[in-house]
């Protein structure tokens, strides 16, 4: 099918998709929280116990893997609360989103606002602001100084994106959001409240368990979860035939469908990642809660023709570094 025709059809069906699947289910939302939050808490306590009892730190690191997976699932629930899709009640979305922000370390109000900007500007070369992995065009890269190109190469390397990136997000960007306009008072209040509550929680846990236990538990879990989260976001928008256009030609519906991938994961990984692999559907209709994304995907043959990635083919995204405006595709660094 012609990509333009496919996008045209999808645009026409977007309202129907929203109306049919953009409905919160209290039962499914509560069940999702019930099978995620207690399991996360139990694994976190087991990690702490493994440190306190002297089992050997290898057991702690092993437990960090499933704990990090459940962290990602909790983050997706918070993400849905930010879109107002998880519960029908706005107040419930607000309260649950704020509470989960104490676990994910993402201030709910701040993240909600910047993520909305991402949805409104994804794939727009003239609006590369919040919530994107910074992407230069080939011409922009070549116009930079040698030092500028070096720094961009470092930034786009996997050790930096998946290693230093999560540390930057957790420790700096969401603690002191230097890029946040001062006029966004509600979002600043969200950051300050989240920081204060986290400080009190860390002090309380440190007094109860010891600061070294908190550090030895939180650090590996957050690094693994952060790397998983960054990778998911990376492959959702960074693939060869992605979508980037200037403002005058940019279309939000086309950006949603052509600029977001369908990450075809094993069922257990879809469960852990809250079905965010159906990312093209999420961008087309953000009010669909994660527990209905798969049903939306299976309802339309057109939606199953979205840019598809598997675990194996997603590795090819690693070499995608620049957007070539002339060729209309992502490319690697020039030789």
Question: Could you describe each region identified by the protein language model?
Answer:
Residues 1-69, 94, 102-219, 291-335:
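Non-catalytic, topology-defining segments of multipass membrane proteins
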Residues 74-83, 111-123, 232-241, 272-288:
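Histidine-centered catalytic micro-motifs
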């Amino acid at each position: 099918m012609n990509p333009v025709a496919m996008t045209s059809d999808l645009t026409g069906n977007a309202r129907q998709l929203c109306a049919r699947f953009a409905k919160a289910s209290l039962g499914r939302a509560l069940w999702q929280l019930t099978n995620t939050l207690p399991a996360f808490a139990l694994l976190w306590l087991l990690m702490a116990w493994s440190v306190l009892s002297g089992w050997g730190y290898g057991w702690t690191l092993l437990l960090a893997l499933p704990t990090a997976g459940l962290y990602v699932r909790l983050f997706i629930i918070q993400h849905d609360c930010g879109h107002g899709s998880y519960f029908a009640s706005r107040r419930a979305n607000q309260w649950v989103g704020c509470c989960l922000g104490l676990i994910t370390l993402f201030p709910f109000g701040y993240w909600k606002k910047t993520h909305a900007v991402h949805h409104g500007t994804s794939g727009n070369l003239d609006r590369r602001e919040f919530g994107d992995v910074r992407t230069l065009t080939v011409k922009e890269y070549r116009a930079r100084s040698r030092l500028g190109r070096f720094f961009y190469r470092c930034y786009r390397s996997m050790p930096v994106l998946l290693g230093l990136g999560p540390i930057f997000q957790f420790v700096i960007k969401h603690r002191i959001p230097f890029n946040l306009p001062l006029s966004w008072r509600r979002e600043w209040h969200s950051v300050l409240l989240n920081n204060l509550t986290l400080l009190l929680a860390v002090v309380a846990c440190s007094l109860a368990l010891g600061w070294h236990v908190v550090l030895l538990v939180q650090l590996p879990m957050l690094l693994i979860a952060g790397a998983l989260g960054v990778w998911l976001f990376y492959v959702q928008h960074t693939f060869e035939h992605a979508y980037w256009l200037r403002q005058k030609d940019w279309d939000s519906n086309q950006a949603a469908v052509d600029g977001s991938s369908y990450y075809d994961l094993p069922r257990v990984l879809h469960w852990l990642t809250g079905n965010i692999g159906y990312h093209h559907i999420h961008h087309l209709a953000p009010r669909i809660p994660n527990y209905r994304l798969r049903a939306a995907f299976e309802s339309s043959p057109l939606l199953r023709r979205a840019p598809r990635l598997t675990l194996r083919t997603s590795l090819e995204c690693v070499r995608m570094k620049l957007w070539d405006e002339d060729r209309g595709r992502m490319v690697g660094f020039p030789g």
